Swiss-Prot record:
Pfam families: EGF, EGF_CA, FXa_inhibition, Gla, Laminin_G_1, Laminin_G_2. Residues 88-116 are annotated as: Thrombin-sensitive. The record marks 93-94, 111-112 as: Cleavage. One of its GO terms (biological process) is blood coagulation. The modification (3R)-3-hydroxyasparagine is found at residues 177, 219, 258. This is Vitamin K-dependent protein S. Residues 1-24 form the signal peptide. The lineage of its organism: Eukaryota, Metazoa, Chordata, Craniata, Vertebrata. Residues 117-155, 157-200, 201-242, 243-283 form the EGF-like domain. The modification (3R)-3-hydroxyaspartate is found at residue 136. Disulfide bonds join 58-63, 88-113, 121-134, 126-143, 145-154, 161-175, 171-184, 186-199, 205-217, 212-226, 228-241, 247-256, 252-265, 267-282, 288-567, 449-475, 638-665. Residues 42-87 form the Gla domain. It comes from Bos taurus. The keyword Cytoplasm does not apply.
Length: 675
């Protein structure tokens, strides 16, 4: 506060105005003398012309309010000063102003008390924590704040962390406000850089290499992760990777097989299902090439049973009756039994068969045993009328009413008993006890059809009525040459793949002509116990209406030809050659090779299996686990197979599903024919 000079009134007048009546006591003689001596003003004519002075006017002497106004020359300072001035007088003038003493006891004397009144910064009005300096003014003051404080008295902390200009206080991560300041800090997993603002990630994987145990440590911002391979999850207790049992989550529609690090879904191909594109759900194996499966109950199918006869009839006729048989016959098969007849006591028998495509007759009676083969080849897939008639001294065989054989015979074929000729007739087979009693052994299985039969001149003998409701005894109306796999079973063979000159060597050379009617199925498989060390399959391709050809060892695919068109009315030639070191897979348009170096484990598995005993299956798999191969559906369609240079005859199989047709295949369904 400025201290200004001015005119001063008389001290006595001032005291007369301001002193309360109760305090206006007379001074002692000693004090009165001292006052008069010490406070005597200069008696000069120039006194009133001097500039007002606080020391002279209000300390050395007493001043009134007007005189104080003349000192400060402004009202605000005067109004501020004078009440406090009176307080100082009350404290330090003996016997005066005793009521104000308590508020001024911080000063040692009157001079200190009065001089302090004009300093607005004393006592300090500013916040001690926030001010830097206090600037005195006219009845006012100004607090100069330290950095980080604001307000009239520097009482308010500035939150630097919310400064819109300096976002987050310039901290890269955490800004913490403090009274008058702030500081930056880092999140867990980070350390502060020397600039005290930016944070740097801590690489825990480098600091503690064993922190994840057997898992892989991956550093991430502010932390780390212990990673396991797909199909595993991290165990923080053991610090290792545990296999995830995905099958427990019911991810697969049918069968789920869990294995270390993964799982596989399987569908029951034997029931007509395959794995969908999502590799989890199952869908029906679709037909990609419709076939003409129309049947006629008037056509008797001779290959209904792989083992045993198709039909058995017994005749009891007058003793004058002679044996006769007439029928229409159609086949592509080259060998098999058409009819077999015998007497009731089994002493005489008569056989009509086919060998190398020609009619063969074998018979035995009480006088002779004979066998004759002759006539033209009739296994051309066309209908041929065949008649066999016992004459008085010979047996006549006719094809299309033209005699092709005339066999002499002494006596009757069958001897009457008790005035009757009792005869048993078997279709497409012979009684088991007679299989080894024939003059020349023959494979009795015959894939063929007969119609319009007339046995012993008795017409159809009620056979039509017997077979009418039995679909499996009906023949297909339209067939072509080939072998047909309906997708319901397999054919089993025992084939030696070993090289006779080198017992350690083996070879699988397979050629196939295929015309699939479904795009997924196992064509050929070699089985060892419950494992499948080799399989040749086809699957529907990811490309619509195309198929892939797969070669697999157990559950691993080691060869593939992708996206070829197999479902057409034309057959596709496929060849595969395999030995212990190499695999070649080829079609008419493409040839691929796969070497043991690429699939060492798989070729080792195959080599070990081939040194032992394997069973060959065509058309599918036996009862092995779903997971044994990538594909387990039965093959559906036509297929002819040659293995190591030998054409496979399904009639020679160890076992065969009855629905598999060894030498006939349904024709492709023609839309125009059925409209």
């Amino acid at each position: 506060m400025r201290v200004l000079g001015g005119r001063t009134g008389t001290l006595l007048a001032c005291l007369a105005l301001v002193l309360p009546v109760l305090e206006a006591n007379f001074l002692s003689r000693q004090h009165a003398s001292q006052v008069l001596i010490r406070r005597r003003r200069a008696n000069t004519l120039l006194e009133e012309t001097k500039k007002g002075n606080l020391e002279r006017e209000c300390i050395e002497e007493l001043c009134n309010k007007e005189e104080a106004r003349e000192i400060f020359e402004n009202n605000p300072e005067t109004e501020y000063f004078y009440p406090k001035y009176l307080g100082c007088l009350g404290s330090f003038r003996a016997g005066l102003f005793t009521a104000a003493r308590l508020s001024t006891n911080a000063y040692p004397d009157l001079r200190s008390c009065v001089n302090a009144i004009s300093d607005q910064c004393n006592p300090l009005p500013c916040n001690e924590d926030g001010f830097m300096t206090c600037k005195d003014g006219q009845a006012t003051f100004t607090c100069i704040c330290k950095s980080g404080w604001q307000g009239e008295k520097c009482e308010s902390d500035i939150n630097e962390c919310k400064d819109p200009v300096n976002i987050n206080g310039g901290c890269s991560q955490i800004c913490e406000n403090t009274p008058g300041s702030y500081h930056c800090s880092c999140k867990n997993g980070f350390v502060m850089l020397s600039n005290k603002k930016d944070c740097k990630d801590v690489d825990e994987c480098v600091l503690k290499p064993s922190i994840c145990g057997t898992a892989v440590c991956k550093n991430i911002p502010g932390d780390f992760e212990c990673e396991c391979a797909e199909g595993y999850k991290y165990n923080p207790v053991s610090k290792s990777c545990d296999d995830v049992d995905e099958c427990a989550e019911n991810l697969c529609a049918q069968l789920c097989v869990n294995y270390p690090g993964g799982y596989s879904c399987y569908c029951d191909g034997k029931k007509g299902f395959k794995l969908a594109q999502d590799q989890k759900s199952c869908e029906a194996v679709p037909v990609c090439l419709p076939l003409d499966l129309d049947k006629n109950y008037e056509l008797l199918y001779l290959a209904e049973q792989f083992v045993g006869v198709v039909l058995y009839l017994k005749f009891r006729l007058p003793e004058t009756t002679r044996f006769s048989a007439e029928f229409d016959f159609r086949t592509y098969d080259s060998e098999g039994v058409i009819l077999y007849a015998e007497s009731s006591d089994h002493s005489a028998w008569f056989l009509i068969a086919l060998r190398e495509g020609k009619i063969e007759i074998q018979f035995k009676n009480e006088k002779t045993t004979k066998m004759t083969t002759g006539g033209k080849v009739i296994n051309d897939g066309l209908w041929h009328m065949v008649s066999v008639e016992e004459l008085e001294q010979s047996i006549s065989v006719k094809i299309a009413k033209e005699a092709v054989m005339n066999i002499n015979k002494p006596g009757s074929l069958f001897k009457p008993t008790n005035g009757f000729l009792e005869t048993k007739v078997y279709f497409a087979g012979v009684p088991r006890k007679m299989e080894n009693a024939l003059i020349r052994p023959i494979n009795p299985r015959l894939d063929g059809c007969i119609r319009g039969w007339n046995l012993m001149n008795q017409g159809t003998s009620g056979v039509k009525e017997i077979i009418q409701e039995k679909q499996n005894k009906h023949c297909l109306v339209n067939v072509e040459k080939g072998s047909y796999y309906p997708g319901t079973g397999v054919a089993q063979f025992s084939i030696n793949y070993k090289n006779e000159s080198n017992p350690e060597a083996w070879q699988i050379n397979v050629s196939l002509n295929i015309r699939p009617s479904a795009g997924t199925g196992v064509m050929l498989a070699l089985v060892s116990d419950n494992t499948v060390p080799f399989a040749l399959s086809l699957v529907d391709s990811a490309t619509e209406k195309l198929q892939d050809i797969l070669v697999s060892v157990e559950s691993m695919v080691i060869g593939r030809i992708e996206a070829i068109s197999l479902c057409s009315d034309q057959q596709t030639f496929l060849e595969i050659r395999v030995n212990r070191n190499n695999l070649e897979l080829s079609t008419q348009l493409r040839k691929d090779s796969f070497h043991s170096e690429d699939f060492q484990r798989q070729f080792a598995i195959l080599d070990e299996a081939m040194k032992g005993t394997v069973v060959t299956y065509l058309g599918g798999l036996p009862d092995v686990p779903f997971s044994a191969t990538p594909v387990n559906a039965f093959y559906q369609g036509c297929m002819e197979v040659n293995i190591n240079g030998v054409q496979v005859d399904l009639d020679e199989a160890i076992s065969k599903h009855n629905d598999i047709r060894a030498h006939s295949c349904p024709s492709v369904w023609q839309k125009t024919k059925h409209t």
